[in-house]
Curated annotation (Swiss-Prot):
It comes from the Bacteria. Belongs to the glycosyltransferase 85 family. This is Galactan 5-O-arabinofuranosyltransferase. One of its GO terms (biological process) is cell wall organization. It comes from Corynebacterium glutamicum (strain ATCC 13032 / DSM 20300 / JCM 1318 / BCRC 11384 / CCUG 27702 / LMG 3730 / NBRC 12168 / NCIMB 10025 / NRRL B-2784 / 534).
Length: 661
């Protein structure tokens, strides 16, 4: 992004000394992705051979993570300083003589460090603190249980099946999970255990790919590296527990810039935009919808105000059509089922309004390093408003704030747009603008402000000062990232994993009995992927690829699964089991009236030795607009209903009921 038009570039200014051509850009993106994938995966595997203590009760892991973060940033910062020194000396502004060319070995080393530094940061912040546990951030708690269940499903089934219900296409975007399932198969890991390495590796790849992308956009390797590292730090602080969403968010600032170029007919930018929007739609639709709306707004502004032509709208149509084709890989089966008249009910994915969803974020007023960087970004966006690509960023900011406002407004209609999730995106945009603002000041603005006072020596000192301040600010912020994620890391150690163990070596919870339940079901001849189970033990479904008769909550349930109707059917069975359905045959007949594939297995909380207490199943109810928005209410089944045609077995606190057939 050159902040000037061609006629306004200061004499001798070189703002794009490292710009990649199209072929080099493609090679760099593919190369960065492959290198980051191998780099992160090998380091993750190596860390699994170490014996670091659990993160919570010991500071050893924190110290190792901080030292690694510092090493990554210092090495990258030093090589960047050398690169900027070379760039400064070769700048025709100074007319220096006998300038030595940059050594090829240092060029290669700087490229390697710059392209891999974001991946190394991901490893330092996540892989080191999680090295002694098999679980990822947040363990298996709350939303991570659903995500783990989906990855377990994708590792077991190469098709795009629903994470829970049998014989149903997925509603939740499957792209990230499907790829994670393939990595699980490659490594020979169960899906739940592959969640951690796939989250780390995929975010490392996305972070590293940002460097060549921004190098193409800005024409500067140091600026591209700075944006990638800042983006990685912010994502690791704000959204690392949801890796597929984090990956999409990383690319949003770049997509805003590309939207401006697409509107002008840049075919290379168009191809990149199609791939980004299409793939992002298979990863996380909320961010995709917001950035797609921004792209529409940018093209309309360019068509109506800048070019006064219909051409930008034609390019927009190509962008939309191409990305939709890619998106249909994931969304096609679900949309086809909906079009064919499949029943829908219980869709409440947008029924969530936390406190942060009631306020507009103003990151540039935060008293932090990132807040200061965002303030610099705000100043840059205001000062360089005449630049078309800066205007595109403003359009995106306006769209995201409007989305948040609409999300707050439509709460009156009993819904939201989950606007609070765009907080991260706004921080990324302003922080990215902050990096561009620093580069703009060093390369151009200072010479406009002080055209005669800035000598070659002064410019050198200014560059040195900026590098030192940026590096120290980055170190200060980045070394605190493991602590920012401390609660999520602690859950990865305190939750019981799929092998029935806690990584902190404390006694495991009730989930330690899941293996025994699975062994019992396998002994009975049940095939997990073909067996429908009624249970409120989400973690069991996260660790083993059984099919659920009911999803755990309506917020992640497939609308085609008719969550509300299933709840009513289950509760009716439970209530009537104490009356006319106490007879096993009548209970079986009533169960067979289910409009959906009936469960062959029930897993209850209760005791075989205390039949009068009943066997408990928790029904999940949507309480929106209240927060928390879910309530679990116990309904109890009469054990007498299972006296015949069913077998029962006590496994720890669970009663496992299996059909005789």
């Amino acid at each position: 992004m050159n902040p000037y038009g061609p006629s306004r570039v200061p004499e001798g200014e070189v703002y794009r000394p490292d710009r990649l051509n199209r072929k080099a850009t493609l090679v760099a993106i593919v190369g960065a992705a492959i290198l980051a994938f191998a780099f992160a995966l090998v380091l993750w595997m190596g860390l699994k051979q170490t014996n670091l203590p659990a993160f919570g009760p010991s500071n050893v892991t924190r110290a190792v993570a901080s030292a690694t973060i510092a090493a990554v940033l210092i090495v990258t910062g030093f090589l960047t300083w050398l690169w900027l020194r070379d760039e400064h000396q070769s700048n025709p502004r100074w007319e220096l003589e006998d300038v030595k060319p940059r050594p090829k070995w240092r060029t290669a080393l700087t490229y390697l460090a710059s392209y891999l530094s974001p991946a190394a940061l991901v490893v330092a912040v996540l892989a080191i603190p999680l090295s002694a546990t098999r679980l990822y951030l947040d363990g298996i708690s709350v939303d991570q249980g659903f995500r783990t269940q989906f990855l377990t499903r994708m590792a077991d089934d190469i098709g795009l099946s629903d994470m829970n219900y049998i014989d149903m296409p997925t509603f939740y975007p499957a792209g990230w999970f499907w790829l994670g399932g393939r990595l699980a198969n490659l490594l020979g890991l169960p899906g739940w255990e592959a969640f951690q390495p796939w989250a780390i590796v995929s975010m490392a790849v996305a972070a590293s790919v940002l460097v060549p992308v921004w190098q193409r956009i800005t024409g500067s390797l140091p600026v591209a590296t700075g944006i990638a590292l800042v983006t990685t730090c912010i994502i690791l602080a704000m959204n690392s527990e949801e890796p597929y969403a984090a990956i999409v968010a990383m690319g949003i600032p770049a997509m805003l810039v590309l939207a401006s170029r697409i509107a002008k007919g840049d075919k290379f930018a168009l191809a990149g935009g199609i791939i980004y929007l299409g793939v992002s739609a298979t990863f996380y639709t909320l961010f995709t919808g917001a950035i797609a709306l921004s792209a529409v707004a940018v093209c309309i502004v360019v068509a109506a105000i800048v070019q006064r032509s219909i051409k930008p709208l034609l390019w927009l149509a190509v962008l939309g059509g191409g990305s939709i084709v890619i998106a249909l890989i994931s969304w096609g089966p679900y949309l086809l089922a909906s079009i064919n008249g499949a029943e829908r009910s219980g869709d409440s994915a947008t029924h969530y309004l936390p406190l942060e969803g009631t306020q507009f974020p103003v990151p540039f007023l935060a008293s932090s390093v990132v807040g200061l960087l965002c303030l610099v970004g705000l100043i840059y966006l205001v000062v360089r408003f005449h630049n078309n690509e800066v205007r595109a960023m403003w359009v995106g900011i306006a769209v995201f704030y409007a989305w948040m406002g609409m999300s707050m407004a439509i709460t009156l209609l009993g819904n939201t747009l989950l606007g609070f999730r765009l907080d991260t995106v706004l921080v990324l945009i302003f922080a990215t603008a902050g990096v561009l603002g620093i580069a703009d000041f060093r390369l151009a603005s200072v010479y406009q402000l002080y055209p005669t006072q800035i000598t070659e020596r002064t410019a050198t000192h200014l560059t040195n000062l900026i590098v030192v301040l940026v590096l120290l600010g980055g170190l200060y912020y980045a070394q605190d990232l493991p602590q920012k994620n401390a609660r999520a890391i602690d859950l990865a150690y305190t939750d019981t994993d799929g092998y029935g163990e806690r990584a902190d070596l404390y006694p495991a919870g009730a989930a330690r009995y899941y293996k025994d339940i699975n062994d019992h079901l396998l002994d009975q001849g049940f095939e997990p992927s073909e067996t429908v189970v009624l249970t409120d033990e989400l973690d069991f479904m996260s660790y083993y690829p059984y099919r659920g008769y009911q999803a755990f909550t309506s917020h992640y349930a497939n609308p085609l699964g008719e969550f509300g109707n299933r709840n009513a059917f289950i509760e009716d069975l439970a209530i009537r089991s104490w009356d006319e359905l106490a007879d096993p045959q009548q209970f079986s007949d009533a169960l067979n009236t289910s409009p959906w594939t009936i469960p062959e297995v029930f897993i209850f909380r209760g005791s075989i030795d205390d039949p009068d207490a009943g066997w408990k199943y928790d029904v999940a109810e949507d309480l929106y607009p209240n927060n928390p928005n879910v309530r679990f209410r116990g309904v109890y089944f009469n054990p007498e209903s299972f006296d015949q045609m069913w077998q029962t077995k006590q496994v720890g606190p669970f009663v496992v009921v299996t059909h005789n057939e």
